[in-house]
């Protein structure tokens, strides 16, 4: 909800809806931008209505704090796989892919991953990708893997390592020194940058890399 408020307050996005399990309905005020979907007895999403809700949006942001409930993970993975609108996953939402059917999910051209190097390492392994990516690799090695990976899959990637922000799309990789941006190694992962990337790509939907680089400043 904090990220939705940040997005709605700082950028002229017409509607910012927050999708929540209906188990929380009695605990929250009846605000018009809350969308409640059916939940399990434990308070997690059942999966009902997720895909339909995502297709009603111009852009989807899965900000994280995802329940570890197996039903939730399975249904979110299925919804992301068929998402017809651009969908950015960040923080622990990225792990949905590695735990689902990564090779098929990664074929969705609307998918954007704002992921750490360890998350990408896990994902490439789960997808049986023939190259590795690790924290100990050089910037050039990581960039080369992202170059090849985004040629193999139509997925876009934003990550950070060795003081550099890396943005990859369709085989093109751009590196931006973090020290030249408005973010630190901590605030990079707060969710606000992910939200800003969503906003900038709504304004300029035809150039993912340029829009995402602009979000850093």
Language-model segment annotations:
Residues 1-86, 95-109, 117, 124-217:
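Small-residue (G/A/S/T)-rich helix-start motifs and N-terminal tracts that mark the onset
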Residues 114:
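Active-site segments of SGNH/GDSL-like serine hydrolases
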């Amino acid at each position: 909800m904090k990220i939705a408020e940040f997005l709605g307050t700082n950028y002229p996005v017409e509607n910012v809806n927050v999708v929540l399990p209906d188990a929380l309905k009695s605990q929250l005020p009846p605000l018009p931008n809350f969308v409640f979907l059916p939940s399990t007895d434990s308070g997690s999403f059942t999966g009902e209505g997720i895909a339909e809700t995502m297709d009603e949006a111009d852009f989807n942001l899965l900000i994280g704090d995802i329940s570890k409930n197996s039903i939730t993970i399975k249904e979110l993975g299925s919804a992301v796989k068929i998402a017809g609108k651009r969908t950015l996953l960040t923080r622990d939402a990225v792990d949905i892919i590695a735990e689902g059917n990564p090779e098929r999910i990664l074929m969705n051209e609307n998918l954007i991953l704002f992921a750490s190097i360890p998350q990408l390492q896990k994902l490439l392994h789960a997808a049986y990708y023939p190259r590795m990516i690790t924290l100990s690799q050089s910037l050039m090695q990581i960039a080369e893997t992202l170059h090849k990976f985004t040629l193999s899959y139509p997925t876009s990637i934003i990550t950070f390592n060795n003081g550099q922000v890396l943005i990859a799309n369709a085989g093109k990789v751009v590196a931006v020194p973090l020290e030249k941006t408005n973010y630190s190694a901590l605030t990079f992962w707060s969710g606000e940058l992910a939200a800003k990337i969503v906003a900038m790509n709504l304004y300029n939907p035809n150039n993912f890399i340029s829009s995402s680089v602009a979000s850093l400043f």
